[in-house]
């Protein structure tokens, strides 16, 4: 059986730990990928010793439909990111991956952080 792939993204700096907690809660048999926006990256780098990949790397393998992700979770999802996804704007890795999920009819879960 093919290993399932899940993409988790964080687009809100104040809730980057929520995205990481989701990664921790996913079963070990799932292949996990994590994306974060620049603000999320700044907060995480200050709070941990992790090196994070750039949200501007729109050519990353997970930005392609051929990558075959089964689902994507954006938690937290800023209103800016939600609006870009709703309007079809794919100008960074998070929004590009979300666009691919919609195009491929895959699960896309958005967890807004403000209303």
Predicted regions and their residues:
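A cross-family phosphate/adenosyl-ligand binding-site feature
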Residues: 2-109, 113-115
């Amino acid at each position: 059986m093919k290993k399932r792939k899940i993409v988790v993204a964080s687009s809100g700096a104040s809730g980057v730990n929520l995205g990481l907690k989701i990664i921790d809660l996913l079963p070990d048999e799932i292949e996990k990928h994590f994306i974060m926006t620049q603000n999320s990256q700044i907060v995480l780098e200050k709070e941990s010793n992790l090196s994070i990949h750039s949200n501007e790397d729109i050519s990353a393998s997970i930005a392609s439909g051929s990558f075959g992700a089964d689902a994507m979770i954006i938690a937290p999802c800023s209103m800016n990111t939600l609006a870009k996804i709703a309007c079809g704007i794919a100008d960074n890795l998070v929004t590009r991956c979300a666009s691919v999920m919609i195009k491929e009819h895959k699960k896309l879960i958005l967890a807004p952080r403000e209303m």
